[in-house]
């Protein structure tokens, strides 16, 4: 899961996981979902609320942010960490950023 280009990467990776590794996976990149949750919970919280609504403790979340500072992605990483939900974070621009410190 990510924003902008990171969302596109997440979407492509999820297809590869399903096609090659036969792993059931999905992304929360549906415009209706994003706009509904962002409207109801604020943009910085929509990913956390989507995780609460659609996930189980068996899920693994991959959160991507080039900068590592996207508030909605960082909040989701912190929520996963706090609730013992398996998590992988990917970020790139700076080594020490809030996202890399969460995952």
Predicted regions span which residues?
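Glycine-rich phosphate-binding loops that contact phosphosugars or nucleotide phosphates
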Residues: 3-103
């Amino acid at each position: 899961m990510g924003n902008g280009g990171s969302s596109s990467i997440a979407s492509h990776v999820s297809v590869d996981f399903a096609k090659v590794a036969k792993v059931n996976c999905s992304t929360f990149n549906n415009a209706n979902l994003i706009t509904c949750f962002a409207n109801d919970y604020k943009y910085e919280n929509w990913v956390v609320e989507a995780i609460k609504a659609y996930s189980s403790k068996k899920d693994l979340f991959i959160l991507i942010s080039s900068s590592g500072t996207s508030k909605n992605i960082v909040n989701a990483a912190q929520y996963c960490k706090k609730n013992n939900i398996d998590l992988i974070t990917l970020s790139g621009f700076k080594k020490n950023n809030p996202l890399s410190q969460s995952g």
